[in-house]
From Swiss-Prot:
It comes from the Eukaryota. It is a multi-pass membrane protein. The chain crosses the membrane at residues 11-31, 51-71. This is Uncharacterized protein YFL015C. Its main location: membrane. It comes from Saccharomyces cerevisiae (strain ATCC 204508 / S288c) (Baker's yeast).
Length: 164
């Protein structure tokens, strides 16, 4: 309803969802890959191999490319003012007609659809498992450092056992 009353409403909603997608999805994933690929200690302790890392990076890049490049191009003339008052102008964007859009005012659907489809990958890519794995590894290392073999104590025990 708001889309028909305010023609620029869709533009702001679309921009909001694009910004939300960038802020919640692409930026953390790129930051994660920077941390993983540029810190050798975490690369050594990270449970995924390089093939899995690069494949998930390709998924992030492809979904971001689809959102930022293909979606605006596929909308085409529908972003003009006179098209906001038309009902279901899917003839000039056949790619999105498969989603069965009934109202032209529902513009952020591609962004929502992309974010929902990509959210499992995003949630899987969050770093707590990595950092917990890393912290467990660090704690094991510290425990090994704290409990070195004390040859003096073992020698004293042997002497007591031999003399007793």
């Amino acid at each position: 309803m708001l889309a028909y009353t305010f023609p620029s409403f869709n533009f702001y909603v679309n921009g909001f969802f694009s910004f939300l997608f960038l802020f919640l999805f692409l930026f953390p994933s790129l930051l994660r890959f920077y941390v993983i690929l540029c810190r050798p200690l975490q690369v050594a302790t990270y449970p995924l191999n390089r093939c899995q890392q690069y494949s998930s990076l390709a998924i992030f890049t492809a979904s971001g490319f689809w959102l930022l490049v293909l979606v605006p191009r596929a909308k085409g003339p529908s972003t003009r003012r006179h098209c906001y008052r038309q009902l279901a102008p899917t003839h000039h964007r056949p790619f999105f007609s498969i989603f069965g859009w009934a109202v032209s005012g529902i513009r952020p659907l591609p962004e929502i659809f992309t974010w929902i489809c990509a959210s499992p990958f995003f949630l899987h890519s969050l770093t707590p498992p990595t950092f917990s794995h890393f912290s467990v590894y660090q704690e094991e290392k510290k425990e090994k450092r704290r409990t070195p073999k004390n040859t003096e104590q073992e020698g004293n025990r042997m002497c007591i056992w031999m003399s007793g």
